[in-house]
From Swiss-Prot:
Protein name: Peptide chain release factor 1
GO molecular function: translation release factor activity, codon specific
Organism of this sequence: Thermotoga maritima (strain ATCC 43589 / DSM 3109 / JCM 10099 / NBRC 100826 / MSB8)
Places the protein is found: Cytoplasm
Record's function text: Peptide chain release factor 1 directs the termination of translation in response to the peptide chain termination codons UAG and UAA.
Region (Disordered), start-end ranges: 262-282
Phylogenetic lineage: Bacteria, Thermotogati, Thermotogota, Thermotogae, Thermotogales
Length: 342
């Protein structure tokens, strides 16, 4: 970080910089100073927490400063990440496990709903399809709030549950999965969709159990012909609203597709967000008999399963952010590029 700062100081001292370059490097310098400030506050808070533990302070006092530390990490992520968008689109689908996987998908949807409430974010359901037993075959929802995508992107992947299903009479523990995909919502101006590339179909919206809930064809299905991406929406009252919602989702999926294609061209080090839903690709396990949640990306374990499912996700996400920052600081920063020699 100090080397980056010195590099920009040298760049700012060059007499041949244009006003635009001067402005850009000035902004980068200010950003580094703010990052340094928050990094120092994180270090001080960590040291203070250790001191409280050594002195045997009560857990409530320690917990207060741990929550403050979680918030500092999220502020640091907001500064570091170029993808710290305030708008996210979240998609949840059952993986392996049949009806139990659909019930687990419902639990995850409830968890994110509660988390959004805790963060003061706005959550809007775009599309939801339920099973006869109350599980979810698919749910797509928008989340809007400070750094919503920058935080929720850590939830992308395969989530695994180990528990006795309500449908299991023998009391045996089953393993099921659900996939979560988190995409940044993309503005219309940021990605071009040509009308001639779209096939738009309308149909009657259906409710629980497949029964039709209205007599007009208000539901909309959009197919992007060049890529084969299909988006349908029937939650809104009018055909126009459903079409606009479907286009919002389509823009995000096209952006993600373009991003993944670009990343594959540059590097093979990243994989797709959610994989196939196979158990071996899990990012997190929720073990009910042991009251345990384990995030396999960082070997993090908590025995607060119910609290986490009730939306208390800040601690686990902050650990992921901390790991991300420590391992990818230079890549995440992406600043301090040198000026071309003339």
């Amino acid at each position: 970080m100090k080397e980056k700062k010195k590099e920009i100081e040298k760049l700012l001292a060059r007499p041949d910089l244009t006003p635009e370059q001067m402005k850009n490097y000035g902004m980068e310098y200010a950003k580094i100073e703010e990052i340094e400030n928050i990094t120092n506050r994180i270090k001080e808070t960590q040291e203070f927490i250790e001191l409280l533990r050594e002195e045997g302070e009560n857990e409530l006092e320690i917990e207060k400063y741990e929550k403050e530390l979680d918030q500092l990490y999220q502020e640091l992520l907001f500064l570091l990440s170029p993808e710290a968008s305030d708008k996210a689109i979240v998609e949840i689908r059952p993986g392996t496990g049949g009806e139990e996987a659909a019930l687990f998908a419902r639990d995850l949807f409830r968890m994110y709903t509660r988390y959004a409430e805790r963060k003061g974010w706005n959550l809007e359901v775009a599309e939801i399809h339920e099973t006869d037993l109350g599980g979810i075959r698919e749910v797509v929802f928008f989340v809007k709030g400070k750094n919503a995508y920058g935080i929720l992107k850590y939830e992308s992947g395969v989530h695994r549950v180990q528990r006795v299903p309500v449908t299991e009479s023998g009391g045996r523990i089953h393993t099921s999965t659900a996939t979560v995909a988190v995409l940044p919502e993309i503005e219309e101006k940021d990605i071009e969709i040509r009308p001639e590339d779209l096939k738009i179909e309308t149909f009657r919206a259906s409710g629980h159990g497949g029964q039709y809930v209205n007599k007009t064809e208000s539901a909309v299905r959009i197919t992007h012909l060049p890529t084969g991406i299909v988006v349908s929406c029937q939650n809104e009252r009018s055909q126009y609203q459903n079409k606009q919602t479907a286009l919002r989702i389509l823009r995000a999926r096209l952006y993600q597709l373009q991003k993944e294609q670009k990343e594959r061209e540059i590097s093979q080090k990243r994989k797709s967000q959610i994989g196939t839903g196979e158990r071996s690709e899990k990012i997190r396990t929720y073990n009910f008999p042991q009251n345990r949640v384990t995030d396999h990306r960082i070997n993090y374990t908590s025995y607060r399963l119910q609290e986490i499912l009730d939306g208390d996700l800040d601690e686990i996400i902050s650990k992921l952010i901390e790991h991300d920052i420590e391992n990818n600081l230079e890549e995440v920063l992406g600043i301090g590029a040198s000026v071309e020699e003339k």
